[in-house]
Amino acid sequence: MLGAVKMEGHEATDWSSYYGEPEAYSSVGNMNAGLSMNPMNTYMSMSAMSTSANMTAGSMNMSYVNTGMSPSLTGMSPGTGAMTGMGTGVASMASHLSPSMSPMSAQATSMNALAPYTNMNSMSPIYGQSNINRSRDPKTYRRSYTHAKPPYSYISLITMAIQQSPNKMLTLSEIYQWIMDLFPFYRQNQQRWQNSIRHSLSFNDCFLKVPRSPDKPGKGSFWTLHPDSGNMFENGCYLRRQKRFKCEKKPSLREGGGKKLSEGSSSVGSAANSSSESSVGNESPHSSSSPCQEQKRSLVDMKSSQGLSPDHAASPASQAQHLLSQHHSVLSHEAQSHLKPEHHYSFNHPFSINNLMSSEQQHHHHHHHNHHHHHKMDLKAYEQVMHYSGYGSPMTGSLAMSTVTNKSGLESSPISSDTSYYQGVYSRPIMNSS
């Protein structure tokens, strides 16, 4: 350290001209008292404030003290403390090398050499804060928070779109449009994610391609959920699949395949049964290209396998309704072997599709679900017990107490209409796309 000071000693004029303006400090002792309180500082300040005759020795002592003390300084970093000592040593060596320089100028030089580093250290928190609080360029943000990527997989998005549709089937362009309407993130880079949607539809067994019927002209085939796929997502939460659906064999029109296709339509959603029932009842038995043609053929196969009377087979509409009511009763036992058939919670989860849609859509979507009414009652009671009634729920305190204590009182309460129920849960959608 001292060798470096001796080597740079002849540049004392450069140092004094570089830090030209003297900083005004009351004494070196006050400045060091703020840094730490050890007895070395007392000696350092006394030696710096000694008479002009002893100034060179004092400043030399100052350089030694600063060099040895630099790791223990509290206000300054060790490297800066060493630099301060070097600057002081340069100033004191200048008083040795140039006899024409008075000891007072050496003191001023040592003060000037010491002052800028100390000044820089005292200003460094302000510099740091200004760097932290500096306003960022808005271009550095990729997008705002409302346009962040949704936490759903592509299979979840497709399943949501298909399940909310009235006929439980959508074309590819309708799936695209539904996703873009609900999630603003997917309004950009459409080519990338739409390619992934097509791959997900093609390579997953839970999605079936349904040919377009002549009574529905247009472009593109329909996509629907496999009737056996069941409740793929945990309690209607689309964030995680509980089981990957795999077809054991390709569904055929034989008896086994027909039974496989006919079962499980209510595990996708209860409205699928009512819509398929009405479509089977309305269409003629010879229109083989109806949207539910696989299910109709499977029902005919089931009819032939059960050996019903020929006069019963003359009315295929009543036949289909009868078979549908039959396989409704069998469905609960068969579905337990595949996936958990917990439909009670399927459509009223914080991340479910009903809470993403507005209340009008929910009312329209669940218009056919009057037979699921008691399940919605259970959900409302659970919501009141768990103290979630603050989300815009118009229920009074007495009604909330009756949900906890008296279940029959709840079922006769005025909350039993669909519109009041859904407007009570959420008056507006959680993720609106505006």
From Swiss-Prot:
Coiled coil: none annotated. SMART domains: FH. Keywords: Activator, Developmental protein, DNA-binding, Nucleus, Transcription, Transcription regulation. Residues 149-243 bind DNA. Residues 249-339 are annotated as: Disordered. GO terms for biological process: mesoderm formation; positive regulation of DNA-templated transcription. It is found in: Nucleus. Acts as a transcriptional activator during early development, limiting the extent of mesoderm formation in the gastrula. Binds to DNA via the target sequence 5'-GT[AC]AACA-3', with 5'-GTAAACA-3' being the preferred binding site. PANTHER family: FORKHEAD BOX PROTEIN (PTHR11829), HEPATOCYTE NUCLEAR FACTOR 3-BETA (PTHR11829:SF167). This is Forkhead box protein A2. The gene is foxa2.
